[in-house]
Amino acid sequence: MSLWELEDRRSCQGTPRPAQEPTAEEATTAELQMKVDFFRKLGYSSAEIHSVLQKLGIQADTNTVLGELVKHGSAAERERQASPDPCPQLPLVPRGGGTPKAPTVETYPPEEDKEGSDLRPIVIDGSNVAMSHGNKDVFSCRGILLAVNWFLERGHTDITVFVPSWRKEQPRPDVPITDQHILRDLEKKKILVFTPSRRVGGKRVVCYDDRFIVKLAFESDGIVVSNDTYRDLQGERQEWKRFIEERLLMYSFVNDKFMPPDDPLGRHGPSLDNFLRKKPLTSEHKKQPCPYGRKCTYGIKCRFLHPERPSRPQRSVADELRANALLPPSRAASKDKNSRRPSPSSQPGSLPTEHEQCSPDRKKLGAQASPGTPREGLMQTFAPTGRSLPPSGSSGGSFGPSEWFPQTLDSLPYASQDCLDSGIGSLESQMSELWGVRGGGPGEPGPPRGPYAGYCTYGAELPATPAFSAFSRALGAGHFSVPADYAPPPAAFPPREYWSEPYQLPPPTQRLQEPQAPGPGADRGPWGGAGRLAKERASVYTKLCGVFPPHLVEAVMSRFPQLLDPQQLAAEILSYKSQHLSE
């Protein structure tokens, strides 16, 4: 190959030139571009990356730049949410479709605004609060600030404090004021308002600031914060009186802590949260279920919920009778007629009793007594199971051991069941009426107490003992006092360990022969009446004994032998009891 050809080949291939070193500016630009590409892969825009790199510098660490980008991105997101796009893009629709409606942006008020709008306006008696915080010796403006801050922390925005304008004057030894600058600060925030006052002839003329407070709170349907009851203003207007009773929020200061009560209107009123709201959040005062359940012995006085007895009246039987005694006779009679319940003996499907199966005469008696009044049904219900009370005119019959077996509480009439709720005494009186009284000796069954002592049931027979004869004579005479020779032995009923235990049953005794001659009062009822009158009096006596002590019932019914209305008798018993308090 010739030299000329070799030079031509070199000229065609080109001779390599030495590489030139990049400048510092080019290196910086390349590094910047590399970092921008790296952060763009993470989802950040070029503008955000350039602003952060310009702030931190190109030599900043990758973690530092990434942290700043995260902060910058969250701030931009908040700004984007705060100012939504006024012209949102319309959604794409297929060809031929209708014109899409522009989406409406629903603006919801902030949660704090909704919370504040539901709260009542607050009107604070500044003088009362300041003097209370100063222990009634110093006008402590710090107390006003504590009260205002307490309501501001709860979300209240409408707060007004009234203070007389003369409190802006320089304090004097006789009128000490502390932290007076707080009044000016609250006035600048438009929370505190000074009531007008001026000097006339060297004397200070002060407007009545209490009237400002009550008037503004009444017109704005707000809350008055004060320990003053404003008695003078209650007498001016009736609506102000009602408003002050329902909207006055009292308070206490525990050192520097403002403490209003959790129950501003008492333990049965609304809570503090609902008291300060225009609409209560939840329904309150849901009673908790009673922990004792069906074993509860408090009756209607129990403050817990008893779902097993939903139809219980809210008032006791005594309160019902007292209320009925104050009603006119016509309204009381209609109310008593509506409140009566059907007796268990009138329910369908009841088994025939023993006396209906053994004697046709007894069947006739039952047929005659069946269409009677509800009082007769109540009286028959009170009789022992399987027995019926014959009319008072029947002289035959006697008492037997089967008549002394107690009833269950379910078989009691409703009047007796209601009075079990009135306490321990009424329960024991019911038990004593059910089991009766034993007298004469350990083996002799004594006559029962109560209005049924004069009646004889179909069964065994009793001897004419002196105690029984004396008791019969006492019944025939028209009163129920037990004679002196009638003394029940202490061994008749063993003592009970607990009051809730029932009396133990007496031991069964053998049936004795019927006395030859009935007592002089055997053909008459307990009060000397006969037939329907005696039954009605017995029924009324049973009802009243469930409410009042038996001796009071006997005394009043003996004074008014022809009076059978329970409401009138209850009124007479109350009157008699008030006149004989020493008994």
From Swiss-Prot:
Highest taxon of the lineage: Eukaryota
Keywords, ordered alphabetically: Angiogenesis, Apoptosis, Cytoplasm, Developmental protein, Differentiation, Endonuclease, Endoplasmic reticulum, Hydrolase, Magnesium, Membrane, Metal-binding, Nuclease, Nucleus, Phosphoprotein, Ubl conjugation, Zinc, Zinc-finger
Modified residues (Phosphoserine): 83, 422, 426
GO cellular component: cytoplasm; cytoplasmic ribonucleoprotein granule; cytoskeleton; nucleoplasm; nucleus; P-body; protein-containing complex; rough endoplasmic reticulum membrane
Membrane-crossing residue ranges in chain numbering: none
Record region (RNase): 96-281
Cofactor binding, note field: Mg(2+) is required for RNase activity.
Sequence ranges of Basic and acidic residues compositional bias: 1-11, 73-82, 353-364
Region of interest: Ubiquitin association domain: 26-71
UniProt topology in membrane: Peripheral membrane protein
CC cofactor: Mg(2+)
A Pfam family reported for this protein in Swiss-Prot or TrEMBL: UBA_6
CDD domains in alphabetical order: PIN_Zc3h12-like
Location in the cell: Nucleus; Cytoplasm; Cytoplasm, P-body; Rough endoplasmic reticulum membrane
Swiss-Prot/TrEMBL domain comment: The C3H1-type zinc finger domain and C-terminal region are necessary for pre-miRNA binding. The C-terminal region and proline-rich domain are necessary for oligomerization.
Function: Endoribonuclease involved in various biological functions such as cellular inflammatory response and immune homeostasis, glial differentiation of neuroprogenitor cells, cell death of cardiomyocytes, adipogenesis and angiogenesis. Functions as an endoribonuclease involved in mRNA decay. Modulates the inflammatory response by promoting the degradation of a set of translationally active cytokine-induced inflammation-related mRNAs, such as IL6 and IL12B, during the early phase of inflammation.
Protein name: Ribonuclease ZC3H12A
Source lineage: Eukaryota, Metazoa, Chordata, Craniata, Vertebrata
